[in-house]
Amino acid sequence: MGECSAGRLDLTEQTPILLGSKAMAASLMDVGDSFGDPASPLVNRSRNSLVEGDNGDDDDVVFIESIQPPSSSAPVIADQRHFVFPASRNKKLQGHYSVILPSSRYLASQKGNTSETIVIDDEEDMETNGREKTVSSSFIEWGFPGTKNRTKDLDFSTSSLSRSKTKTAVGPFNPGRMNVAGGEFQNGGFTTHHSPDSWISQSASFPRNQKQPGVDSLSPVASLPKQIFQSSAQQQPTKAAKITCANCKKPLQKGQTAYQRKGSAHLFCSTTCLSSFSHKRTPKKRNVTCKKDAPTKKATVVPQGESSEPFPKCFSTSHLSPYEDSQNLRKRVLNKSRCTICNKLTEIRHEVSVNNVTHKLCSNQCFNKYRLANGLVMNCCEQCGEYLPGKGAGNNVLVIEGQQMRFCCQSCVNEYKQMIETNLKKILASENRKRNAVGEENERELYGSLNILPEKTEEIPEKKEKTSELQVSAECSLDASVVQQNVNLPPSVSDIADKLQEQLGEKPSEDSIIPAVLSADPGTWPRILSIKQRDTLVENDPPQVRNFNFPKDSTGRKFSETYYTRILANGEKTTRSWLLYSTSKDSVFCLYCKLFGEGKNQLKNENGCRDWQHLSHILSKHEESEMHINNSVKYSKLKSDLKTSKIVEASEHRLQEREGKDGVKLLYTLDLI
């Protein structure tokens, strides 16, 4: 096709090569003819006439219209995108216009004649279902010297993003901006300029015919400013939080002992606050559900949308299935542990860690028993639980059963004494009730046995004639230990009297045969101790052998009195009152395990322990064992019970002495027929 005048626009065969091929449809709108032509004809090309090629892709319709050129001017800025005009590979374009694209050198020489008017109206309507995008841009037209400045509005419409990417000989879609004057053509398309912010939508552009402040007209459009987010934790300074007791709300001081229940976040200042404060969960109904029927967890995915987060958020449902509820209930049951003192499988309230060994205690009573057995000193008042910062702070000290108890003031001491007296009175009253019940039962048995006497005497005819009347006088004291008979009773009556003596405890026991008093040497003690012997040893506390010339063994080692003392981690020294040395067997024994121990133990067996080389390690390991701690608790408990029983017996003896003055002698007279 021949060349036309410079004022017209010819579409030649080289146009697809210069502008690109097979990606976007454009409608070229003629601005006007500077040589007198009134308007350019409208050229329409059908979509169906252009459907040819190797891949069979569809091309869009191209419209060429005429519009009035704008009068305003602006710096030259063009779009950096790769716009490709659709064209069929086998058909030629028809028309009387040709697009002349000059080189960069020619544009630089004709800079004064180039129109400075450009309108950047880059509006993208992106749909989520992947439909077409429409991008409208306005480009300038470069004319020859002496001609008027022209503006060509190019309307580009892309079929889809996937179609433009599948075309060959076409660069990737780049929505950035570049200067047309500095652009180059390579293989029918613009030079590719990759920008790190090229994916950001440029819909928020500046108004028409207005220069962006602070940005050069020949530089790419500045990317949107990035927002800097700071966490609220960094913006606000951290404040030191006060730790308070969950029950009494008193602040905990530095160095104060705090108590915490297992599985709870609450802290307490004393065991009193810990026991009084209770948060028990409401019991849940247990649903028996098969694991196969348990619903599976579902995850909800939040799509990204317009958020700047790089990955979608995933979160699972918070509701658990009935099967999982039952599993959690089973775990809570399994969380129960066995108490070190009472051996009950229950919830644990106290945990004491001694030399990396944790001892679990279920109640305050067990904790106090453990503390008394191991000589633990508390830094708080025994009555109110007030914190005592130093040893000198607790001036009021009360010694009970060999243990020192600290109090914050004299009022707490008086309250504690009153509480002990009240408990002692309750114990005495219960013991009196038990003894009175036993005495009444013995009296009923005595009445019943006397009523049987007439029946027994009828069986003996010889005695009937001789004996007309039997008189039985019985003198009863508080313990009902003496029964006097004024007449000779038949053998059946004597048998009843023997039974009565057995019930009243007058029959000698087997324990009286075994000597109750034992030597202080544990090597001479029998293997099995009687109850009386054990009680005697607990009451009297066997002494430790001191100031003795301990013999040496074959290796030249011997026992030393330094083993009687234990040095704690904080430097304090405590006495091992349970360690006894046997002079007869030249070995050591554990008093607690010897009296209450079960099973095999070096410090419990008949020969004891005489490994002087490793004795220090053996003793430290033994006193931390669970068996030794349990036996020590049993020892201290029995000792306190024996003291209490002695007090009760002494009080009863005083009562008997008072009532003995007004004693009543009962005479029972039986008439035998």
UniProtKB/Swiss-Prot annotation:
Mapped zinc finger ranges (MYM-type): 266-300, 312-352, 359-394, 405-432
Q: Where is this region: Disordered?
A: 190-218
Give the SMART domains listed for this entry: TRASH, ZnF_TTF
Q: GO terms for biological process?
A: negative regulation of transcription by RNA polymerase II
Report a single Gene Ontology molecular function.
zinc ion binding
Please name the PANTHER family in this protein's record. ZINC FINGER MYM-TYPE PROTEIN (PTHR45736), ZINC FINGER MYM-TYPE PROTEIN 5 (PTHR45736:SF7)
Relate the assembly described in the record: Interacts (via N-terminal 120 amino acid region) with ETV5 (via C-terminal).
**Which protein, by its recorded name, is this?**
Zinc finger MYM-type protein 5
Organism the protein comes from: Bos taurus (Bovine)
